[in-house]
């Protein structure tokens, strides 16, 4: 009778475990369906899963991958922690699911990028592409190429960046991802802007704007339009077409939803007015940039206000703005140096742990060989 009772209880536990596992996977399926269209709902569903710390194996890996993806799509700073996504990378790296392995590596690359570790970010993106190249995940391949291009552009490797962006366009086109194509066109235009090839800038920006026009009324396409106008506007400014530059940059400032981009655009516009000696208009747009929360942007705004006050021979105010600008640049430099020191410290700690591990293994080998000698000595006796 007791045996039957134990078997019954065991069966109930197995069934309950099976139901819980099934419910979790059902929740994951729903999250994946929501991710691209309703990313906020996807994040909410993940946060409602009870006791995620108790998940193990595939469930744990799937959970942290989806959570990292949802946080990224909702622009949350909590994505900057690499401890979660590393679990997914380690789980999938030797498995047969190249899509999830590639996706985990891609998001690990983004986390490394946010932490300022360009080398690890680049390696992660390249490893992601290696996993994805035989799959049909063209959109993810396009994103990986785009982020590799951004890293190369930051390193002034413009030719490499252009090649990466062109590969990105090809992948987005295969994925029928028009928005991805638009962002890649903008990236290409920015490279040509740096190279001062303005005809090519206008070519790619106009192609991107035409695609936006085809999707008029769609919020994602309306969101990218101001940044396209900004690139075109500063190119017009550099060519001396100030009338069209002002029209384009004004429209960009008025329609830009991203505050950081809007503040940069307002400084570009203010600089044109400063050079035209339209000081009231210049001050208006420089002051707008003072609402930024980023030290480097604020430093730029204060620097332009310093130039403006200096031109009006208001030296006391000019000196005040100059000191504010220098102070913010110093804070930004200190933060970068602190980040570099932290990176070096982590490398040192990792190297130290590796050395300790090697020493332990060496001691184990010595103990093993010593034991063998003792055994042989006893046998020979």
Where are each of the predicted segments found?
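Structural motif corresponding to the intra-repeat A-B loop/turn of tetratricopeptide repeats
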Residues: 74-75, 95, 108, 115, ...
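N-terminal leader/linker segments that initiate helical-solenoid repeat arrays
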Residues: 19-82, 99
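TPR-repeat structural position
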Residues: 39, 77-78, 98, 118, ...
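Amphipathic alpha-helical segments of tetratricopeptide repeats
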Residues: 47-52, 86-93, 127-136, 167-171, ...
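Hydrophobic positions within repeat-based interaction scaffolds
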Residues: 25-43, 51, 79-82, 280, ...
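Residue signature of alpha-solenoid helical repeat architecture, marking inter-repeat boundaries
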Residues: 21, 56-61, 99, 139, ...
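TPR/Sel1-like alpha-solenoid repeat signature
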Residues: 64, 101-112, 124, 131, ...
């Amino acid at each position: 009778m007791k045996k039957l009772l134990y078997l019954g209880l065991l069966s109930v536990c197995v069934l309950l475990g099976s139901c819980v596992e099934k419910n979790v996977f059902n929740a994951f399926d729903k999250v994946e369906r929501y991710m691209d269209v309703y990313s906020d709902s996807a994040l909410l569903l993940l946060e409602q899963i009870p006791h995620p710390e108790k998940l193990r194996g595939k469930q744990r890996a799937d959970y942290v991958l989806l959570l990292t993806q949802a946080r990224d799509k909702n622009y949350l700073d909590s994505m900057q922690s690499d401890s979660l996504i590393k679990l997914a990378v380690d789980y999938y790296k030797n498995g047969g699911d190249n899509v999830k392995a590639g996706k985990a590596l891609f998001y690990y690359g983004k986390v490394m990028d946010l932490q300022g570790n360009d080398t690890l970010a680049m390696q992660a993106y390249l490893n992601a592409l290696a996993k994805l190249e035989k799959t049909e995940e063209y959109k993810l391949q396009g994103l990986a190429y785009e982020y590799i291009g951004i890293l190369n552009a930051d390193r002034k490797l413009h030719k490499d960046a252009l090649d990466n962006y062109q590969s990105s366009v090809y992948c987005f086109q295969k994925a029928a991802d028009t928005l991805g194509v638009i962002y890649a066109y903008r990236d290409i235009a920015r490279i040509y802007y740096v190279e001062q090839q303005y005809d090519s800038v206008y070519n790619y920006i106009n192609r991107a704007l035409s695609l936006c026009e085809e999707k008029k009324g769609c919020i994602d396409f309306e969101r990218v339009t101001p940044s396209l106008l900004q690139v075109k506007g500063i190119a017009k400014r550099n060519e001396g077409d100030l009338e069209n530059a002002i029209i384009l940059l004004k429209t960009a400032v008025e329609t830009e939803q991203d505050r950081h981009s809007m503040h940069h655009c307002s400084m570009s516009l203010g600089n044109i007015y400063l050079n035209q000696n339209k000081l009231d208009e210049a001050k208006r747009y420089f002051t707008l940039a003072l609402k930024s929360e980023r030290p480097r942007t604020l430093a730029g705004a204060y620097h332009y206000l310093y130039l403006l006050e200096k031109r009006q021979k208001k030296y006391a105010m000019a000196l005040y703005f100059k000191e504010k600008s220098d102070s913010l640049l110093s804070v930004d430099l200190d933060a970068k140096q602190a980040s570099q020191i932290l990176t070096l410290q982590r490398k040192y700690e990792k190297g130290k742990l590796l050395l300790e591990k090697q020493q332990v293994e060496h001691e184990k080998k010595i103990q093993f060989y010593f034991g063998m000698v003792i055994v042989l000595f006893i046998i020979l006796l």
